[in-house]
Structures are given as structure tokens and as C-alpha cells.
Amino acid sequence: MAKDALLVLSGGMDSTTMLWDYAGSIAAAVTFQYGSNHNIREAECARWNCEQLGIEWIEIDLSFMGKHFKSSLLDGADAIPEGNYDDENMRSTVVPFRNGIMLAVAAGLAESRGLKAVMIANHSGDHAIYPDCRPEFVSSMGKAIADGTYEHLELRAPYTGMTKGEIACRGKELGVDYSHTYSCYKGGEHHCGKCGTCVERREALEFAGITLDND
């Protein structure tokens, strides 16, 4: 299998699972620093997993987003609401058009390196509150990337129809060490267990029968 893809890698459960799942086709992974509460912790995990697989890790600064965009995810731990992802208050964590911006940069980076595709690890649980994770967006962005690059790059999003629990099950099969992933929107040393992404993380791990000590 040719290593022809660039993965957008946050360091969370989903993109880390995709890194291990598709390591045979991933030439490099890119992590974006955009000023979120959990960026630093996520990036540490992203780099660690790339090192384990011998995949090149690239870090790109998008700090202008943290300075100019409105989102509780950019406003410090105290601004993060608690509850499930489908709760109305979790909409405050949306960073406007985050995936669109990251995919555009990733597409330019991939074409500059002579790669054929960009990969993103959105999943069905994201669709409720994140417009730029929905199948319609992925389809439209994929067309824009193909039309806007000389080599007609492909946008691959193989987890779009999967739940986070199903992704965790796949990670378990692959032997992914989820203690080297980070999800909490508050950005603390340990997962708070109360914000939407922590709740979803816990439910996914339980679904897959995975127990993490001191998470």
C-alpha cells in the first residue's frame, strides 16, 4: 500500500485510531495549534503516537483562530459547559469552520509534498453540533479540494458513518493505547469527566470494554 495520505491528527481518540488503522497509507500527520484549551495536551499525544509508528509529525500554528474566533473552547477551562454532546449548551464549544480551515491548509501541504489525499477522522457522533463534521460538509469540502488542486486530491473520511464506540472497538482490535490520547475540553492534567467530550470518551471506552487507570 502506498503512503500517499496526510492525516489531520488532533491527538484525540478518533484521529489517533485512524493513525494506527491506516498507518500503511499515511505518509505524515499534521497537528494544528489554534489556541484551544486542550491543544498542548493533544499535541503531546499526537507526537507520541507518530513516533511509535515512525510517521512524520508536522505541527502548524493557527493561533490567529484563538485570537479572533469566538468559542468557549478558546476561552479557558472555566468557560467550558458540562453535559452531553447533544445538549444545547455544548454548541458554545464549536470553533467556527475549524475543520474547513484545517482541511484547506492540509490540502495545500499534501499537494506541496506530492501526496494524493487528506484524511480526517470525523464520526457520526460529531454530526449533531458540529456543522463541519457532517457528511454534507465532508462531501462538499472533498469536491472543493479535488477541484482546487492540480492533482485532484482526495478527501478520505472513512469513519464518517461510525460511532465513537465503534471506533474505540476498532482501536482495541489494533491495540491502540488510549492512555496516550487526550480529549478533555478543559485541558487539565486529567480528564474532567464532565464536559461533553469527556462524557463521550467514557461512554465509548465502556462500549469497547476498555478501562484506563488514572485517565
Question: Which residues are covered by each model-predicted region?
Answer:
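Short cysteine/histidine-rich metal-coordination sites, predominantly Zn2+-binding motifs
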Residues: 187-188, 209-215
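Short amphipathic alpha-helical interaction/hinge segments
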Residues: 149, 206-209
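ATP-dependent adenylation/nucleotidyltransferase module used to activate substrates
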Residues: 1-175
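A polyampholytic, Gly/Pro-enriched intrinsically disordered region
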Residues: 81, 174-178, 202-206
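Local cysteine-cluster metal-coordination motifs and their immediate loop/turn environment
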Residues: 104, 180-203
